[in-house]
């Protein structure tokens, strides 16, 4: 039928729901009816319950832009307002306005890991004695949302890196959109592309990638510096914390939201 992918979800121990998206020109109602009959016959022969098959036609839509109508301004922490670049921001006294157009990159401020990192940056830069002269590295910058937040919260200079060229492009666009061109340096790559030692590092990617990077964090973070790490599931936190401690970092706080967590660590 031309199906290029499918998803499955278990309901209890004996039920599974399978979703498949089929290109309409390549499949007809007669084909679907024949598929339903074939599944029924196979189930009866195997002595299994007869599966239910349902289908509906989905009209063509520009999925790359239709999501925008569902994304609204959001307040994060006590100091930030994240606003889609195509909307007028609501009144925001006492908050920094962060305008964002993520494009194809990760990071809109809605995911728990992004929110945890934003709140941690606020604590470090505005609640930890100020951000005057502080430099920050954003590893795996995605849309650039964490770099933007760090700069808006007072960081003197932010170095944003990502291996994805689309993320680099998105970060540069959002940097310029927020008038932060002179304070955020963007490069394609990883830790080796951070040009100088920094006071703090934020990294919101995947736990496995973070584990591989931990031994190298001390090469780019100054003595007495700090880390903000997320993209980590609760069940992965212990392993990440142990790796940090093995590399002379102390986990100062673990913040949780749903199934995700954020580790705040400092150098021993």
Model-identified regions with their sequence ranges:
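Hydrophobic beta-strand segment of the Class I
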Residues: 201-202
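Conserved SAM/SAH cofactor-binding pocket of Class I
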Residues: 104, 108-190, 194
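N-terminal auxiliary segments of SAM/dcSAM-dependent transferases
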Residues: 1-92
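A short glycine-rich, Lys/Arg-flanked "PGG" loop and its adjoining helix->strand segment in the class I
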Residues: 214-226
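Short helix-capping segments at alpha-helix termini
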Residues: 41-48, 154, 176-181, 223, ...
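SAM-dependent Rossmann-like transferase core, predominantly class I methyltransferases
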Residues: 60-130
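Conserved short alpha-helix immediately C-terminal to the canonical SAM/SAH-binding motif I
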Residues: 166-170, 209, 236
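Active-site capping/gating segments
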Residues: 233-268
């Amino acid at each position: 039928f031309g199906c290029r992918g499918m998803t499955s979800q278990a309901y209890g121990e004996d039920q599974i729901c399978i979703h498949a998206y089929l290109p309409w020109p390549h499949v007809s109602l007669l084909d679907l009816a024949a598929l339903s009959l074939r599944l029924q016959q196979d189930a009866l022969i195997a002595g299994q319950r007869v599966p239910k098959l349902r289908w509906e036609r989905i009209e063509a839509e520009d999925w790359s832009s239709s999501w925008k109508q569902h994304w609204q301004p959001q307040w994060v922490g006590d100091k930030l307002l994240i606003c889609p670049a195509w909307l007028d921001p609501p009144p925001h006294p006492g908050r920094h306005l962060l305008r964002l157009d993520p494009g194809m990159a990760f990071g809109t401020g809605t995911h728990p890991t992004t929110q945890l990192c934003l709140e941690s940056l606020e604590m470090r830069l505005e609640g930890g004695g100020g951000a005057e002269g502080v430099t920050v590295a954003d590893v795996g910058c995605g849309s650039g949302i964490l770099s933007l937040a760090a700069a808006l919260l007072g960081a003197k200079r932010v170095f944003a890196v990502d291996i994805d060229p689309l993320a680099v492009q998105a970060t540069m666009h959002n940097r310029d959109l927020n008038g932060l061109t002179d304070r955020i340096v963007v490069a394609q790559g990883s830790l080796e592309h951070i040009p100088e030692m920094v006071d703090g590092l934020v990294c919101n990617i995947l736990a496995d990638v973070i584990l591989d990077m931990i031994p190298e964090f001390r090469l780019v973070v100054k003595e007495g510096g700090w880390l903000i790490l997320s993209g980590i599931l609760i069940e992965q936190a212990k392993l990440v914390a142990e790796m940090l401690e093995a590399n002379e970092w102390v986990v100062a706080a673990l913040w949780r939201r749903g199934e995700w967590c954020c580790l705040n660590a400092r150098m021993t």
